[in-house]
Amino acid sequence: MILNSSTEDGIKRIQDDCPKAGRHNYIFIMIPTLYSIIFVVGIFGNSLVVIVIYFYMKLKTVASVFLLNLALADLCFLLTLPLWAVYTAMEYRWPFGNYLCKIASASVSFNLYASVFLLTCLSIDRYLAIVHPMKSRLRRTMLVAKVTCIIIWLLAGLASLPTIIHRNVFFIENTNITVCAFHYESQNSTLPVGLGLTKNILGFLFPFLIILTSYTLIWKTLKKAYEIQKNKPRKDDIFKIILAIVLFFFFSWVPHQIFTFMDVLIQLGLIRDCKIEDIVDTAMPITICLAYFNNCLNPLFYGFLGKKFKKYFLQLLKYIPPKAKSHSNLSTKMSTLSYRPSENGNSSTKKPAPCIEVE
């Protein structure tokens, strides 16, 4: 917990009554190394995703719009990652000034909300494409997808405004270091509680429930299709993919959300045990690595569910340029069905059930 604040030379001076919390030599070595790996892999992977979707696939489907924006949001975050690597390697000493502190912190917050919102919209799009293919044709347009992405970027920016306002550079007097951090006055609990609950609920709980519901309904629809076509072999890999998508999202973000909430309790003074604070401050950067590394892999993960994405991705790696006139589209592995149950749940029994194809 931080207390006893004063201002001098434009930098707020504060006291930290748990100055050793989270400060371990292995953290100062391991975390910058992980950040560096995430930076290299993320920049390389997401840049290739942008090139494949925009230049090879020509951005012709709703899913491709969401994946392109997902990759762009990740790239915005990744560009600030070297700052955090240096910050951690310097034992949490921030040398870049107040403006970069705000920008880098806002980038982290922005990526969290933008990525989660885009993944949620992608799950809704898959639900509409598979469960309600006929009814959703007028809704699943490129214009709607682009407008949705604009709204998502605006909402993510709005959700990041408190970070820009309240994240600052502070000088901790009893450790003689300058940090980039949030600082809450103990008598004002509205701000930290609001930020923490917003991150937990808007940044995880609601999106996870929507994603879980969407893919559960997709699961049921595909299962019903396989039951009708009893003479066709069931492709269990589709169901494994659905399960992997839900579990991938859940386990990527749950640890970070838990320790974020505990950190808010510490800032409010509700947790005053330095041992617990040490656990939280030590675990926080590790959960950040887990969450954001998986986040940066999402465009590749979702993209490789489509056969055409894999085809063009390999072409790019072989330096094969895109064709001048391309009519390719992005279809995730669950987006195209040659057989679809009718919207009211009834299916014709006069004709043999056609083969189900999932790309």
From Swiss-Prot:
Its main location: membrane. Residues 56-61, 126-141, 217-239, 305-359 are cytoplasmic. It is found in: Cell membrane. Residues 336-350 have a biased composition (Polar residues). The keyword Manganese does not apply. Residues 1-25, 90-98, 166-190, 269-278 are extracellular. InterPro entries: ATII_AT1_rcpt (IPR000190), ATII_rcpt (IPR000248), CCR1-9-like (IPR050119), GPCR_Rhodpsn (IPR000276), GPCR_Rhodpsn_7TM (IPR017452). The keyword Transferase does not apply. Adrenal medulla, cortex and kidney. It is a multi-pass membrane protein. One of its GO terms (cellular component) is plasma membrane. Angiotensin II binds at Q15, D17, R167, F182, H183, Y184, K199. CDD domains: 7tmA_AT1R (cd15192). Disulfide bonds join C18-C274, C101-C180. Residues 336-359 are annotated as: Disordered. Receptor for angiotensin II, a vasoconstricting peptide, which acts as a key regulator of blood pressure and sodium retention by the kidney. The activated receptor in turn couples to G-alpha proteins G(q) (GNAQ, GNA11, GNA14 or GNA15) and thus activates phospholipase C and increases the cytosolic Ca(2+) concentrations, which in turn triggers cellular responses such as stimulation of protein kinase C. Interacts with MAS1. Interacts with ARRB1. Interacts with FLNA (via filamin repeat 21); increases PKA-mediated phosphorylation of FLNA. Belongs to the G-protein coupled receptor 1 family. This is Type-1 angiotensin II receptor. The lineage of its organism: Eukaryota, Metazoa, Chordata, Craniata, Vertebrata.
